Amino acid sequence: MFDKFKWKAALVEYKKCFVQTQWPDEKYKWEAVKCFQVNWNVNSDDFAGMLTKALSQTGNLLASVNHFPARMIIKFAEIAVEEVRAMFMELYDEDKDVCERIESFKQKANRLLERYGNGAGQHYQYENAISTYLWLRYPDKYYIYKLSEVKAVSDKLKSDYIFKKGAYALSLIHI
């Protein structure tokens, strides 16, 4: 549980300051959602090209120093188009448990890395990137999972749950 009074106070403050403080720093995320929504077509004949366009405005959401999930999933889509298409179809299947879908996406990325990685050390398809893909497709239902932010909010709200690295499924239940 968490302190509901702190939650309400934080929410009021966030809403009060949103336009002046938050929106300038957050607008690009919603532009990325719009770009994704406009370009996403899982049945595209040029799936890799479509994926490139759909993810083109994600910027630091799917790329940072030594972390390249967008570039890697696009590279996999160029090499193994039907496998990556199937990964996204399963990820976006709302009839299945979200934690199972995320785990399956990671495992399939592992297999792609083994087969097509050409010595790459990792595929970068972890909870943060996968939750970003979910959020881009269903922004009213999902948001980007970032353990450091989850912990910060948990601390601010005086939550009694301890969020741990690698315990994504448990963390998701308690968010």
Predicted features by range, described:
Residues 1-123, 138-173:
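An N-terminal alpha-helical hairpin/helix-loop-helix interaction module that forms a charged
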Residues 130-137:
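Contiguous, well-ordered alpha-helical segments that form the cores/surfaces of helical PPI scaffolds
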